[in-house]
Amino acid sequence: MSNYRDIAWQGLWKNNPGLVQLLGLCPLLAVTATLTNAIGLGLATLVVLVGSNVLVSLVREFVPKEIRIPVFVMIIAALVTCVQLLINAYAYGLYLSLGIFLPLIVTNCVIIGRAEAFASRNSVVKAAFDGLMMGLGFTLVLMLLGACREILGQGTLFDGADLLLGDWAKGLTIHLWQVDTNFLLAMLPPGAFIAMGFLIAIKNMIDKQLEARKPALEAAPAVTRARITKVS
């Protein structure tokens, strides 16, 4: 159980693909103009990451080491193609909104990195759990960045939710305040870089505070219980 807890901690926080490894920055910065786009790309990446980890773990004993990277890339490309076709069929608006960044999931270093570093060396269950945690960590960063940029740029949340969930989701859009013109800096890639820098800085501050508390806890004297014997 502690092993799985460590895998979850690595993927969600300590070794987060977006905030620590800084992998997949191209789609992370380009697509997160709205929360809806961030959720769509995050879920697509999550599905591919879990699927590729499972398949790589299944075939790891049969693939020669010399050709393992091309085989891993082919597995990832096949999964991305399936996800792309599904989004094209059931969420065409989101498919158009994500554009070229959807097929570019194939080149996402997070996916090929986990396939090589973890899935090819561990069991199917552990590989699937690692893919799930890394995918969730990446998706959470996408969502947080997308929410910040959408709020600052448009004053809304869940704008275009119907692209992901259908026409019924048009009512999910939240208007936080009325803006005459969008704040372009937040909507464009330079704003994404700035917002990403703030997120990384906040994480580093939290990590430093956690590290500072450890010596104090370790230096605290242990409390021993004294036994009192009543003498009559």
UniProtKB/Swiss-Prot annotation:
One term under GO cellular component: plasma membrane
Residue ranges that the Swiss-Prot or TrEMBL entry lists as coiled coil: none
Compartment(s): Cell inner membrane
Transmembrane segments: 18-38, 39-59, 69-89, 93-113, 127-147, 182-202
GO biological process: electron transport chain
Keyword Transport part of the UniProt annotation: yes
EC number: 7.-.-.-
Pfam families linked to this entry: Rnf-Nqr (PF02508)
InterPro entries: NqrDE/RnfAE, RnfE
Domain of life where this protein originates: Bacteria
Alphabetic keyword roster: Cell inner membrane, Cell membrane, Electron transport, Membrane, Translocase, Transmembrane, Transmembrane helix, Transport
Keyword NAD: no
Membrane topology: Multi-pass membrane protein
Family to which this protein belongs: Belongs to the NqrDE/RnfAE family.
Assembly and interaction partners: The complex is composed of six subunits: RnfA, RnfB, RnfC, RnfD, RnfE and RnfG.
Function: Part of a membrane-bound complex that couples electron transfer with translocation of ions across the membrane.
Protein name as annotated: Ion-translocating oxidoreductase complex subunit E
Organism: Shewanella loihica (strain ATCC BAA-1088 / PV-4)
Source organism phylogeny: Bacteria, Pseudomonadati, Pseudomonadota, Gammaproteobacteria, Alteromonadales
Annotated gene: rnfE
